[in-house]
């Protein structure tokens, strides 16, 4: 059995929807055990309320929150980790950064060496830092000793020119629009499923399971 966990942060639900699609793709692989977790929120509730995020976060309130006590089982215990984060100035969110910065003990034990790592993201605009967010995230995964997997061009949907779409060789992405009203398209969700399946198949081969 190959164990794959999806770890995400979402404020308005875009990354959550992508995470569910990634998980669905991973579950298509025979013998895959797939989990999905959200990272802890660091913003005060009054700030979230002003940002209009209280109601939207209820959409995925049923998803378990990854606590520090769970890091050993959920993160170090997985064969592959697929991370999802919105862009923040071309980087991951502070909420996701806080989780990764807390992995020093596991890093010191080489707990992630040889595991598969992959990333997906969202931004408000077509050129809102999607690629830089994934690439800068990759730097952390390399420091952890992980094997990077992206979204290869065998997934032809990323080359479509007839509609606005996210996605690059670095990983699948979605474009939320300046007001957040655009939800992930079927094309983007299909790419997310592809990436989830692709990562899981590679992790299964590496783990010899």
Curated annotation (Swiss-Prot):
Binds 1 FMN per monomer. NCBIfam families: flav_wrbA (TIGR01755), PRK03767.1 (NF002999). It catalyses: a quinone + NADH + H(+) = a quinol + NAD(+); a quinone + NADPH + H(+) = a quinol + NADP(+). It holds the Pfam family FMN_red. InterPro entries: Flavodoxin/NO_synth, Flavoprotein-like_sf, Flavoprotein_WrbA-like, FMN_Rdtase-like_dom, NQO. It is an enzyme of class 1 (oxidoreductase). PANTHER family: FLAVODOXIN-RELATED PROTEIN WRBA-RELATED, FLAVOPROTEIN-LIKE PROTEIN YCP4-RELATED. Substrate binds at residue 107. PROSITE patterns: FLAVODOXIN_LIKE. Its cofactor is FMN. This is NAD(P)H dehydrogenase (quinone). FMN binds at residues 10-15, 87-89, 122-128, 143. Belongs to the WrbA family. Its EC number is 1.6.5.2. HAMAP family: NQOR. It comes from Methanosarcina acetivorans (strain ATCC 35395 / DSM 2834 / JCM 12185 / C2A). It comes from the Archaea. NAD(+) binds at residue 12. The keyword Oxidoreductase applies. Keywords: Flavoprotein, FMN, NAD, NADP, Nucleotide-binding, Oxidoreductase. One of its GO terms (cellular component) is membrane. Residues 4-199 form the Flavodoxin-like domain. One of its GO terms (molecular function) is NAD(P)H dehydrogenase (quinone) activity.
